[in-house]
């Protein structure tokens, strides 16, 4: 029997029933540091792996912040409203992350539906799989593969779904677990090794990438990846600093960027610049634009007639690509309908989760 043939053993009622849910773990406070200073990054940020204090978590959420090490999916209501997963359908979440969207999609697909979930992150993927399996979503309902979203077209025939899927979701943003883990090197807010790779087992780290990057290329990266207005000034400083020795940590990169900023820059301007530069370098290190272009080029062939696709982007470089792909596909007849405009989070969602502020969603329906 192939993976694409539902069996009588699959759930016959709404909700996950493949296996018994895991028991909830009791709350455990993190241990205090020994001595006066932490000895390594993992010890410095132990709270990221400790069991959360429910009272503290509630206070942070009420204030509009995302607790460290936890992820709050964005535009869930709008995404589910458009994709509208139905019992018995097949869908694909090509950027699984923490699985917040997948969890809701899976519920809508029951009984008899199936979801393919992809993610390239070798560190986050097993944690998310454990969480979703613990909720009762077994292998007959949820297929998880370690794969970049650009590989969707090649993955579908591998699992026997040769004709495509009823819907596709792509959330192009980082998960909070990636951002808040200092060992990953994604954020200027945490001091950690300057890595930034989605897949730590492949390619150059941000440290090594910066060491090899020339001025002209770095300027293009900062402009294309974040529309950075101070691209030339910042690129000149980073190239000069890297020539004296590698930039090993996020803290060192932050200081180098700050040294290129004008003295009269506001605190908000400083933070925005740091976020943009880190974002642009991350995009380049992971070749994210190239992966998105490949995904969009192959996307129509992955959708059944009438298939729906929703894509969440978080900066102009991504959104431009998605917008142009949907527009050109609509004009050529590939898509029968596209979103007339971007869909943004409500003010209420942004107040509850500040990381949602830059999110944009676009959708299309296959002809």
Task: Describe these PLM feature segments.
Residues 1-367:
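S-adenosyl-L-methionine-dependent methyltransferase catalytic core, i.e., the SAM/SAH-binding region
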């Amino acid at each position: 029997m192939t993976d694409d043939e539902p069996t009588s053993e699959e759930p016959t009622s709404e909700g996950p029933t493949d296996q018994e849910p895991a028991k909830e773990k009791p709350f455990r406070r993190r241990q205090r540091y020994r001595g006066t200073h932490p000895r390594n990054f993992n010890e410095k940020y132990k709270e990221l792996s400790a069991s959360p204090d429910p009272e503290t978590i509630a206070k942070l959420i009420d204030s509009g912040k995302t607790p460290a090490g936890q992820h709050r999916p964005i535009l869930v209501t709008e995404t589910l409203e458009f994709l509208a997963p139905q019992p018995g359908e097949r869908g694909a979440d090509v950027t699984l992350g923490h699985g917040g969207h997948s969890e809701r999609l899976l519920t809508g697909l029951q009984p008899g539906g199936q979801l393919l979930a992809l993610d390239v992150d070798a560190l986050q993927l097993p944690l998310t799989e454990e969480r979703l399996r613990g909720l009762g979503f077994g292998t007959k309902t949820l297929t998880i593969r370690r794969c970049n979203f650009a590989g969707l077209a090649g993955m579908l025939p591998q699992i026997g779904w040769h004709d495509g899927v009823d819907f596709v979701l792509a959330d192009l943003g980082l998960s909070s677990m990636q951002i808040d883990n200092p060992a990953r090197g994604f954020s200027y807010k945490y001091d950690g090794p300057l890595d930034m790779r989605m897949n730590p087992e492949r390619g150059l780290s941000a440290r090594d990438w910066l060491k090899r990057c020339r001025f002209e290329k770095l300027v293009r990266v900062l402009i294309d990846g974040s529309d950075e207005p101070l691209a030339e000034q910042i690129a000149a400083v980073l190239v000069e600093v890297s020539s004296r020795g590698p930039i090993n940590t996020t803290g060192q990169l932050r200081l180098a960027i700050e040294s290129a900023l004008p003295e009269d820059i506001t605190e908000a301007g400083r933070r925005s610049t740091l976020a943009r530069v880190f974002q642009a370098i991350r995009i380049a290190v992971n070749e994210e634009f190239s992966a998105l272009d490949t995904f969009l080029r192959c996307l129509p062939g992955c959708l059944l007639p009438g298939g729906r696709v929703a894509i969440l982007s978080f900066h102009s470089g991504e959104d431009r690509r998605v917008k142009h792909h949907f527009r050109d596909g609509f004009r050529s007849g590939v898509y029968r309908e596209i979103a007339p405009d971007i869909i943004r989070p409500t003010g209420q969602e942004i107040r509850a989760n500040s990381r949602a502020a830059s999110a944009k969603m676009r959708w299309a329906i296959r002809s």
